[in-house]
């Protein structure tokens, strides 16, 4: 596997050290709630992401349950990013770990 899998708690700790967490869920779900400080990565926001992250930046990919994040993590590695992680359990795991979220409710 060209990337590592980490727990939501590890992801939060890495974010405190400057890692970028990207949430790849759909627009409505992201707008409703997402991990605090997450960047919403979509096809439309990819150019903005490229300006935000350099190839050595630690990047954590989060999805719904930790499955589709693996595909995006692989894609990012193929684009040249060297420090990529997939978050086990996705946003569901993040919520179960009771980590901070940004929400509209």
Swiss-Prot record:
Its main location: cytoplasm. The gene is glpE. GO terms for biological process: glycerol metabolic process. Its EC number is 2.8.1.1. It comes from the Bacteria. One of its GO terms (molecular function) is thiosulfate-cyanide sulfurtransferase activity. Transferase that catalyzes the transfer of sulfur from thiosulfate to thiophilic acceptors such as cyanide or dithiols. May function in a CysM-independent thiosulfate assimilation pathway by catalyzing the conversion of thiosulfate to sulfite, which can then be used for L-cysteine biosynthesis. The active site is at 63 (cysteine persulfide intermediate). It is found in: Cytoplasm. It is an enzyme of class 2 (transferase). Belongs to the GlpE family. This is Thiosulfate sulfurtransferase GlpE. Pfam families: Rhodanese. InterPro entries: GlpE_sulfurtransferase (IPR050229), Rhodanese-like_dom (IPR001763), Rhodanese-like_dom_sf (IPR036873), Thiosulf_sulfurTrfase (IPR023695). It catalyses: thiosulfate + hydrogen cyanide = thiocyanate + sulfite + 2 H(+); thiosulfate + [thioredoxin]-dithiol = [thioredoxin]-disulfide + hydrogen sulfide + sulfite + 2 H(+). Residues 15-103 form the Rhodanese domain. GO terms for cellular component: cytoplasm.
């Amino acid at each position: 596997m060209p990337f590592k899998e980490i727990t939501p708690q590890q992801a939060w700790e890495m974010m405190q050290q400057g890692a970028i967490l990207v949430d790849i869920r759909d627009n409505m779900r992201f707008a409703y709630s997402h991990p605090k400080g997450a960047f919403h990565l979509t096809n439309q926001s990819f150019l903005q992401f490229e300006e935000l992250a350099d190839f050595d930046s630690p990047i954590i990919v989060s999805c719904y349950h930790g499955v589709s994040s693996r595909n995006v993590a692989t894609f990012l590695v193929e684009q040249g990013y060297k420090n990529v992680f997939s978050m086990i359990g996705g946003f569901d795991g993040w919520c179960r770990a009771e980590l901070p979220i940004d929400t509209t409710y």
